[in-house]
């Protein structure tokens, strides 16, 4: 029980001293009660020897300061020491009263780690009323002299008293807000206080900052170089230059050169050819109607494109027509194919020397064919009147006796020729109405050019048309020859059968007039071409009837 009380009291005293009591308090020996003063002396010696070497060194380094502190030691410290000594003696005497019972010795207190010495505090200005009197200073000096005999122990006591005195000025947080104390091995001046980076950390931070700056400078330089390259590229290769290059490549691909020459340049009759070619753009059908089937017309769009550009430069109507038709109605290639086919017809007519004739070099269309057919109808309509007059003249002539057999042969031959002529007229009218292109017959100017002209006519489809025109001319000539031959015959009228003959002739004439009126009601190309011939044969049929009556 006494050991526990001793330990508690010792710890209480150490806490009150505030670090000055860092000494081991050995247990009393218990040999005799008279050993109490010796025990107190041994306790003080042990306390002085148990002081931490580092604390002693610190106290030695501040000898003058320790002596001054010993002089200033307050009465409270001496009072505590006296109480400790008295308590120890009392406890020792108590042990004697209880007998010489062996009380186990108290275990030695482990050496507490020495607190690092506080750095030199700045001088605190003296506050009146807080300092002790001069007498107290003298007592403190005496106590300091007694403690000085112990050497390092006295220094430790002085420093402990100073700490106890300075603890009055420390806040309730026991100096947590103040700078921490540092021991002998704690670097303070070189590496700074807590919260500041140490040497290695500072080096790492500096290195990272330098790397970031280097990376930023690298990025800025790369961006500036890229911007300069882009500017140079834009200056060297502009959009307009690339467009011009593409346009030149397109022109080269189309014709190799720029615009070509107009098709009428270089010909003898240049003005007439130009007029005819420029007139093609006035009719829309010249561009939408393809060449007739079977015509061998060679056309290359790439080759003809420069020529087309040259023609459009002279003919604004052609450009307008192209804008209206391409590509809404017809494609670009077919547009120029149809147009250049008509141009080739005009050039061919100019080479043959027939340019300017009726139908030659004109744009082929249905209207042209209708105009030609109308002219033919008008010419044929005027022929029956001539036929009637010729019939009247023949009737007024003196009649001659005609042999029956010769008359029959002539009648059959005339009928067969009339049928052939009517059939040919029908075919010609049908071909003219169905044909899309009109041209006159072409005659060779010289025998040396005959083969070349025939070849050109075959390519352009003119050969068949020429043959048809020649056939029509032959038929007209045959009609004239037949009429001349019939005029040579004389009709002989004998009395006795004049009444019957006259009646027969009148009937025949009436029937012929009815047929003629029916033909006039429904005019056709074949009727127009055979009307005059039919009137002649009616007259001769009457003559044949009269001859039969005579027999």
Curated annotation (Swiss-Prot):
Q: Tell me which domain of life the UniProt entry assigns to the organism this sequence originates from.
A: Eukaryota
Sites of Phosphothreonine modification: 186, 530
Q: Which InterPro entries match?
A: BSD_dom, BSD_dom_sf, BSD_domain-containing
Regions of compositional bias (Acidic residues) in chain numbering: 514-523, 536-551
**Stored Pfam families:** BSD
Q: In which tissues is it expressed?
A: Expressed specifically in neurons and transported to synaptic terminals.
What PROSITE patterns does UniProt report for this protein, alphabetically? BSD
Which stretches are tagged as biased composition: Polar residues? Answer: 524-535
* Keywords, in A-Z order: Phosphoprotein
Every copy of the BSD domain together lies at 295-347
Sites bearing Phosphoserine, chain numbering: 178, 182, 433
Residue ranges of the region described as Disordered: 20-72, 117-198, 360-391, 487-551
Under what name is this protein listed? Synapse-associated protein of 47 kDa
What is the originating organism of this protein? Drosophila melanogaster
């Amino acid at each position: 029980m006494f050991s526990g009380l001793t330990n508690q009291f010792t710890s209480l005293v150490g806490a009150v001293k505030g670090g000055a009591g860092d000494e081991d308090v050995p247990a009393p020996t218990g040999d005799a009660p008279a050993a109490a003063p010796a025990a107190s002396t041994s306790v003080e010696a042990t306390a002085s020897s148990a002081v931490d070497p580092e604390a002693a060194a610190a106290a030695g380094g501040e000898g003058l300061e320790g002596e001054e502190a010993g002089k200033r030691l307050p009465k409270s410290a001496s009072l505590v020491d006296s109480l400790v000594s008295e308590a120890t003696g009392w406890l020792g005497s108590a042990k004697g009263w209880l007998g010489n019972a062996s009380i186990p010795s108290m275990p030695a207190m482990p050496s507490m780690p020495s607190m690092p010495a506080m750095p030199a505090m700045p001088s605190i200005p003296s506050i009146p009323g807080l300092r002790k009197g001069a007498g107290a200073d003298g007592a403190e000096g005496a106590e300091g002299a007694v403690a000085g005999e112990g050497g390092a122990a006295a220094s430790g006591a002085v420093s402990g008293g100073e700490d106890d005195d300075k603890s009055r000025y420390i806040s309730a947080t026991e100096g947590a807000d103040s700078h921490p104390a540092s021991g002998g091995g704690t670097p303070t001046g070189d590496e700074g206080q807590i919260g500041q980076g140490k040497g290695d950390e500072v080096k790492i931070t500096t290195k990272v900052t330098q790397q970031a700056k280097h990376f930023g400078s690298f990025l800025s330089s790369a961006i500036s170089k890229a911007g300069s390259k882009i500017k140079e590229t834009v200056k060297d290769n502009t959009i307009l230059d690339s467009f011009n290059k593409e346009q030149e490549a397109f022109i080269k691909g189309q014709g190799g050169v720029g615009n070509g020459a107009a098709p009428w340049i270089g010909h003898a009759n240049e003005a007439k050819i130009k007029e005819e070619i420029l007139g093609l753009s006035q009719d829309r059908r010249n561009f939408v109607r393809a060449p007739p089937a079977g015509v061998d017309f060679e056309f290359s769009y790439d080759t003809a494109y420069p020529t087309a550009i040259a023609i459009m430069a002279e003919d604004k109507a052609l450009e307008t027509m192209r804008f209206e038709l391409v590509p809404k109605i017809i494609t670009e290639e077919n547009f120029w194919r149809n147009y250049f086919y008509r141009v080739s017809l005009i050039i061919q007519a100019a080479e043959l020397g027939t340019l300017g004739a009726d139908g030659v070099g004109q744009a082929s269309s249905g209207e042209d064919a209708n105009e030609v057919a109308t002219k033919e109808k008008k010419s044929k309509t005027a022929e029956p009147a001539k036929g009637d007059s010729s019939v009247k003249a023949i009737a007024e002539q003196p009649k001659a006796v005609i042999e029956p057999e010769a008359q029959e042969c002539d009648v059959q031959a005339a009928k067969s020729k009339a049928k052939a002529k009517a059939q040919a007229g029908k075919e010609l009218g049908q071909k003219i109405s169905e044909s899309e292109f009109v041209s006159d017959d072409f005659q060779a100017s010289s025998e040396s050019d005959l083969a070349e002209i025939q070849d050109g006519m075959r390519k352009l489809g003119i050969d068949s048309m020429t043959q048809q025109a020649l056939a029509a001319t032959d038929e007209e000539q045959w009609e004239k020859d037949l009429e001349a031959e019939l005029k040579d015959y004389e009709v002989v009228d004998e009395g006795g059968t004049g009444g019957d003959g006259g009646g027969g002739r009148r009937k025949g004439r009436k029937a012929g007039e009815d047929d003629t009126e029916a033909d006039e009601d429904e005019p056709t190309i074949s009727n127009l071409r055979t009307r005059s011939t039919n009137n002649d044969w009616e007259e001769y049929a009457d003559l044949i009837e009269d001859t039969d009556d005579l027999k």
